[in-house]
Amino acid sequence: MKKLLGINDKADINYHKFEVRLAARAVAVRHDGEIPLLHVGEGDYYKLGGGGIEQGENIETALRREMLEETGCSIEILRDIGYVIEFRTEWKLIQISFAFLAKVVREVSEPKFTEKEIKEGFRLRWVNLEDAAGELLNEGTKNYQAGFIVKRDSAILEEALRIIKTDYHGRLF
């Protein structure tokens, strides 16, 4: 899998005491060319669907579970996009996000946000794939976490767009 980006807010830090979190994320395209973005009210930014890989899960299983929970959608994973490593020194966290290109197979239910996500004001919004990068970049500089998420998801989306244009001749459907 191709490394897309390394995000580090401080140089020359000893990371041996940092927690490592693995996550799976998707650019999931619906038949009408829209993708789900999650708006986070607390911080006023957008992010791609996906989340942490739980004990005993593989990356693909975690991604399908997270996309169903956060977007209410069943997905078909088409291929990997790449990975992003974030070094969040304020939180003593190294997060590695594995990103995939997917098709939305069907919309199964409403999102089932966690208590934390509800408290943070998560809201699902469908956005045209071509417009999604603008949504990500227009937001997200209002808190520490958002700065990482916007950089991460923008890199993932940029590579997904490149893959769709070159490998899929601009169309997944």
Can you say where each PLM-predicted feature lies in the sequence?
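Conserved S-adenosyl-L-methionine
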Residues: 79-82
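Acidic, metal-coordinating catalytic segment for phosphate/diphosphate chemistry
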Residues: 1-25, 31
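Unchanged
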Residues: 53-76, 86-140
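Conserved beta-strand and immediately adjacent loop positions that scaffold enzyme active sites
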Residues: 25, 34, 123
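Conserved Nudix-box catalytic region and its N-terminal flanking loop in Nudix hydrolases
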Residues: 30-69
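Short connector loops at helix/strand junctions that flank enzyme active sites
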Residues: 19-21, 43, 48, 95-97, ...
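Nudix hydrolase/Nudix homology domain
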Residues: 44-45, 109, 116-173
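Active-site beta-strand termini and strand-to-loop segments that position acidic
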Residues: 28-31, 102-104
